[in-house]
């Protein structure tokens, strides 16, 4: 028997699709429903390695944990990992299949993947009672409707009802709900069952007249109003859509266990990947994690982390341009703690030979670790288990770089010299005993009277956060009505909201016979890079995309119709 399902779409990127999907999964599994998450196509630099060695989006791994099932490649068959302004690495069924430009991806290749993603969805439906799908960006991107495989494309194929999530904290949620619906075709509108308001602050009764008017305009009900929830700490889907400059993560669990706090600075390098590595540190009472992009911000840090990146050579150049490279070398010489993870580990080495990622050839590293890196075309995808500092450690590896360690003390797969550590392993800090031992060493080297809490369990904290998501759905949504959608599909007779989607090819470059722009404004997963305002666009990570007044003027001259203005 095929299981039921639901597509969680959003009015915009960051509307809350990932956490709502996770919350529904946790709510369902607590009701005894065997449920799985699914996202046909994801654009993310935060990824995860499954037990079978497949790379998928980190958000889908988190949703699988919410559903209490083991994540597999079926749950995220297509993953796009941006590596430059106009290209992404395409990961299909957990394995990289090559780099592709945005133009090439839109030129028929994306449509060709529809069969693959629907096959994966059908396999999940044959195994689970319910599959909760997450969309990408907005389903109303009219310029991308023809090639859509992640929003209404997958909903049509599966005949799944669609729940549209809107972030009211941004403002304009009613216009967003109405406009999203009104820009869909009649066929697609017949699947849009209704709406879910996310991140509401205040008295819900003040919102109810607007919800009634929305029903009058669209003929669709609102299935819930989720309150703004602080301190969830759930995995970010990717690091492209937001500048992390100045962002702070710290424990909301308890005050410091010792006399001092421990200050951690994370270099917000370009194309930062798996920055969720620091979440386990931020969960420790007394540890404050800050993302930085200026050399002076390293001065008072007790530990500096150079995180993973999809562009190691680009990150190295960025560190040098910012003066951060010199500051890191100086820290190492002074015996002040530095940790390099994956691409950050590679940066700390002596030399990088890269004919794969950047094709820059041989580039000098910072030289603080006795390591030489050679990029291989085959990607390492692994779930290693080992020990370090006398404690057991588990992690996962996602990298093209092969490390030739030529000295220092062994540290996981990498090495340690003084107070500088380097490893390719992501997720190692989630191993509680190892994390406590590592933080104690950092505190000693930094001269801090910081004591790791003896009972902090990152796994337990994560389960508590997922339960909070399940509680939000159970307490603030019409749970019975949601289950009715999952089992029975969208209500019959939903009215059409004009004007509907324009005919394919109406207006724009396509109807004029010209090639479409290679990087149109679009939701996540459908472009490699473009203008800011939608996930995967702008590539501003940690302040790496700077705009001077002169630069803004040049952009305006090139992209604005000056005569019309």
Region annotations inferred by a language model:
Residues 1-330, 337, 354, 377-378, ...:
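Flexible phosphate-sensing "switch/lid" loops adjacent to ATP/NTP-binding sites
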Residues 349-356:
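Extracellular/periplasmic helix-exit of transmembrane alpha-helices
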Residues 356-382:
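Conserved P-loop NTPase catalytic core
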Residues 526-529, 534, 539-541:
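Long, intrinsically disordered low-complexity tandem-repeat segments
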Residues 532-535, 545-547, 556:
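Short linear motifs in low-complexity or flexible loops
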Residues 342-343:
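Catalytic nucleophile serine of serine hydrolases
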Residues 506, 518-519, 529, 542, ...:
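Short, low-complexity intrinsically disordered segments enriched in A/P/G/S/L with frequent Arg
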């Amino acid at each position: 028997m095929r299981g039921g399902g639901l597509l969680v779409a959003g009015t915009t990127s960051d509307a809350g699709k990932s956490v709502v999907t996770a919350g529904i999964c946790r709510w369902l599994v607590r009701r005894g429903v065997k449920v799985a998450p699914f996202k046909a196509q994801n654009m993310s630099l935060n990824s995860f390695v499954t037990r079978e060695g497949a790379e998928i989006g980190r958000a889908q791994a988190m949703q699988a944990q919410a559903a209490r099932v083991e994540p597999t490649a079926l749950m995220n068959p297509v993953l796009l990992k941006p590596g430059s302004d106009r290209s992404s690495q395409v990961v299909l069924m957990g394995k990289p299949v090559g780099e592709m430009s945005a133009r090439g991806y839109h030129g028929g290749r994306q449509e060709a993947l529809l069969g693959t993603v629907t096959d994966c969805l059908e396999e999940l439906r044959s195994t689970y009672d319910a599959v909760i799908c997450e969309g990408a960006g907005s389903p109303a991107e009219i310029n991308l409707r023809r090639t859509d495989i992640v929003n209404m494309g997958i909903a049509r194929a599966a005949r799944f009802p669609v729940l549209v999530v809107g972030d009211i904290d941004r403002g304009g949620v009613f216009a967003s709900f109405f406009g999203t619906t009104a820009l869909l075709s009649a066929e697609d509108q017949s699947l849009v069952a209704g709406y879910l308001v996310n991140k509401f602050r205040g008295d819900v009764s003040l919102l109810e007249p607007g919800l009634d008017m929305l029903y009058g305009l669209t003929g669709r009900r609102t299935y819930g109003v989720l309150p703004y929830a602080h301190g969830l700490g759930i995995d970010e889907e990717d690091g492209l859509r937001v500048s992390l400059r100045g962002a702070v993560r710290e424990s909301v669990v308890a005050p410091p266990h010792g006399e001092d706090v421990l200050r951690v600075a994370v270099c917000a390098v370009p194309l930062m990947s798996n920055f969720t590595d620091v979440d386990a540190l931020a969960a420790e009472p007394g540890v404050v994690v800050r993302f930085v992009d200026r050399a002076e911000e390293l001065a008072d840090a007790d530990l500096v982390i150079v995180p993973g990146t999809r562009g190691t050579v680009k990150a190295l150049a960025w560190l040098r341009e910012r003066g951060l490279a010199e500051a890191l070398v100086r820290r190492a010489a002074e015996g002040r703690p530095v940790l390099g993870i994956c691409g950050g580990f590679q940066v700390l080495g002596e030399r990088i030979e890269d004919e794969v990622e950047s094709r820059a050839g041989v580039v000098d590293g910072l030289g603080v670790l006795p390591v030489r890196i050679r990029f291989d075309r085959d990607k390492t995808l692994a779930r290693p288990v080992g020990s370090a500092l006398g404690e057991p450690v588990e992690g996962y590896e996602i990298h093209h770089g092969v490390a030739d360690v030529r000295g220092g003390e062994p540290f996981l797969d990498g090495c340690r010299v003084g107070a500088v550590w380097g490893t390719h392993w992501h997720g190692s800090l989630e191993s509680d005993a190892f994390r406590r031992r590592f933080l104690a060493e950092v505190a000693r080297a930094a001269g801090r009277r910081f004591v790791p809490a003896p009972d902090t369990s990152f796994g337990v904290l994560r389960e508590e956060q997922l339960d909070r998501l399940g509680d939000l759905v159970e307490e603030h949504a019409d749970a019975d009505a949601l289950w009715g959608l999952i089992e029975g599909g969208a209500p019959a007779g939903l009215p059409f909201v004009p004007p509907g989607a324009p005919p394919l090819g109406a207006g724009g470059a396509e109807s004029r016979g010209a090639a479409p722009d290679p990087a149109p404004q679009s939701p996540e997963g459908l472009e490699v890079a473009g203008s800011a305002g939608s996930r995967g666009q702008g590539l501003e990570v940690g302040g790496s995309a700077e705009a001077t007044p002169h630069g803004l003027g040049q952009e305006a001259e090139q992209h604005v119709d000056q005569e019309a203005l």
